[in-house]
Amino acid sequence: ILALEYLRKHSDQTIEVSDQAASQPKVHLGMQKGEVFYIKDLLYSLMLESHNDSAVAVAEHIGGSVEEFAEKMNRKAREIGCKNVCFVTPNGLDVADADGNEHSASAADMARIMRYCAFQSPCHETFLEITRTASRTIQDESGNRSFYLANHNALLSQCAEVLSGKTGFTGKAGYCYVAALKKEGKAFTVALLGCGWPPHKTYKWADMRKLDQYAFDTYNWYDIFDREKTFPEVEVRRGVKGTTALTLNLPSEKQTFLMLLRADEKPDIRYEYPTELEAPVHEGQEVGQAS
């Protein structure tokens, strides 16, 4: 998503492959040092096939180095609300930085990242276009070599509610899958980490189907504000009346405030308002907030 947002603001569309990018281990595209590729083609390579060399080539071009790009990743993750991430590489391999901090992210943060990519980023439509592509053939800029890419997200063709998804594997993390789901006006992001190790490559699909069904069966939209809620009257100093009533007053565009909840869940709403006001006080005056 950093690369897509970069492309919105910059005119350069191609990448020359470095020695470091070309020397990445499998799974890789097999690019060679000095070859030139279109950035967007390498994003298909990255998102459909998880090619390590494509990830490094894109990172070096946008960040100047893998290390600088990793810092951009960490900064972006914090901006969108992630709390437990430490990105060291653009391809997610099991490595540590110079201080010994291992490349890592929690399941909750991976779900937050997918939420941003699939629903919130200004480039979310392009992200979905790439990740929903079943297959694609790309070439280097010269047209001398062609590469066939196939999407490994099996649920795209099996479950209509699967909007996007990305598979992954490392020796420490096991088989992983992060997905965005949407159906009947409900949307969810789900992150599965450690869904088995070889040879159990298909466990993640069964686990995702269970969570998919659970989410749509269990969560429904509820209006979280109690329209009948009453508040204690507030003292008005130096006023004609000694006290005034408070009411919940939502803007017209938010007369309903819906949240996906289980039937047994109650939202934790905190009302903040003063215990006294100074005159003059006007009808409709905002004196507190709900959070």
Give the positions of each predicted feature.
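Active-site-adjacent loops and short helices of periplasmic peptidoglycan-processing enzymes
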Residues: I1-A111, A118-S121
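Domain-terminus/edge residues, biased toward the C-terminal soluble/receptor-binding domains
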Residues: D99-S291
